A protein has these predicted regions:
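Primarily a LysM-type cell-wall glycan-binding module
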Residues: 1-19, 42-69
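Glycan-recognition patch characteristic of GH18 chitinases/ENGases
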Residues: 99-195
């Protein structure tokens, strides 16, 4: 499963000849249709088929899957373009299997809002095991506030593809904005906790969720124990009724780490309280900060190693970002606001501006600079090299799996890579 880094003068066809694979498949797998040309330094996923089926007249997907003793979903995973075909074409090539063995049998998850594009959702559901639907808020009395857009259709699509939907609980008030006061009320008041837990159980049952993910941030240090107690009480009730609870953790590297984002996140307590944890190992480079990789590998490794010292490895999910940022230079603290971009979009920008993509070996992250008029920008994003490095780390530590924030933007090469490495 090579990852090819484009050199100056190379074309899709010369690369296809080099690996003896289809040029059309390289374009499709790497979502190159929007690019006028390849970019020096761009990383391309090259999947090498080990077994291919040529469609015969009248054959169906189900018949082909049965012929090779694989599932229909396996066939779609290896050939996601089938999602957009109403029938098979005689003579069409379908990949039955690819070369290479998976690194681990990890679980794959990701967050999504109910307004995700249907075509993105349908494809990503081929490759994940759990979808965390963002999000339910709550009132000071413990009443649930549902998402502004009804999420029922996402739940139904998930179950249609044997993917487990999980309700995400956030401290969002009726205004739809973050409210740290709600965390304080919940942490201090067991009556509010009881009401919220009861409402969560009812909603999980009615909607068809398999559990709850608690995603709270900026918790007061004095609410540390009360928050962990709430997660524990929620987990006990959910487990008794056949559901599970996960908790999202800010990226800490020590128990004494200062800052409102970190101090009340007691990895040991929360690891005991929840069934699983989701490490938010991203946002080192963020909207209002200086240009940096979103998830530099040394930092990610440091957080994971601290988590492993506090939490059983089978409970840990490593967070991976599915986005990048573009910063206007020079960076001015309190003034500069980075623009959020997709990883496929980053390659398109580099192609349009005719600039080379560079790769920081220490951070294991791609980046580049471009100009519009007299304005200069710096971009950090993810590509298949940086994703591969994170998946290798997850496999090395033998943890539960990986999870994405978030699933809203296309990144097909990532999902094909995940399918090869973790399934």
């Amino acid at each position: 499963m090579p990852i090819h880094v484009v050199k100056s003068g190379e074309t899709i066809y010369s690369i296809a000849q080099l690996y003896d694979v289809s040029a059309d498949r390289i374009v499709y797998d790497n979502e190159l249709a929007a690019q006028q040309n390849l970019v020096p330094g761009q990383a391309l996923l090259i999947l090498m088929p080990s077994r291919v089926h040529i469609v015969r007249e009248g054959q169906t997907i189900e018949q082909i899957a049965e012929e090779y003793s694989i599932t229909v979903k396996n066939l779609y995973q290896n050939n996601p373009f089938l999602l957009n075909q109403t029938y098979l074409l005689e003579g069409q090539s379908l990949v039955i299997s690819y070369e290479g063995e998976p690194l681990m049998q990890g679980r794959i998850s990701g967050y999504a809002y109910p307004f995700i594009e249907p075509y993105i959702l349908r494809e990503v559901l081929l490759y994940i095991d759990e979808i965390l639907i963002f999000s339910y808020g709550f009132t000071a009395e413990g009443e649930l506030i549902p998402p502004q857009i009804d999420e029922t259709w996402v739940i139904q699509e998930a179950w249609n593809q044997q993917v487990e939907p999980i309700l995400v609980l956030t401290p969002f008030a009726e205004t739809g904005t973050f409210n740290s006061g709600l965390i304080q009320i919940l942490s201090e008041n067991e009556t509010v906790q009881d009401n919220l837990i009861e409402n969560l159980l009812e909603t999980v049952r009615e909607k068809g969720y398999v559990g709850v993910d608690v995603d709270f941030e900026y918790i007061r240090p004095e609410d540390q124990v009360g928050y962990a107690d709430f997660v524990n009480r929620l987990r006990e009730t959910m487990n008794e009724n056949g559901y599970r609870v996960s908790v999202a953790l800010a990226p800490k590297t020590s128990s004494y780490q200062k800052g409102l984002l970190y101090e009340a996140m007691d990895y040991h307590l929360l690891g005991q309280s929840a069934n699983t944890v989701f490490l938010m190992t991203y946002e080192w480079g963020y909207t209002y900060g200086p240009p940096l990789p979103v998830a530099p590998l040394p930092n990610v490794r440091q957080v994971l190693e601290y988590a492993l010292a506090e939490i059983p490895k089978e409970k840990i999910v490593l967070g991976i970002p599915n986005y990048g940022y573009s910063w206007l230079l020079p960076y001015e603290r309190g003034v500069t606001k980075a623009r959020l971009i997709g990883n496929v979009e980053a390659n398109v920008i580099a192609a349009e501006r005719g600039v080379e993509i560079q790769y920081d070996e220490r951070y294991q992250s791609p980046f580049f600079y471009y100009e519009i008029g007299r304005r200069r920008y710096e971009v950090w994003f993810e590509d298949v090299r940086s994703i591969y490095a994170k998946l290798q780390l997850a496999a090395e530590k033998d943890i539960r799996g990986v999870g994405y924030w978030n699933l809203m933007r296309p990144f097909r090469a990532n999902w094909l890579l995940v399918n090869q490495m973790l399934h």
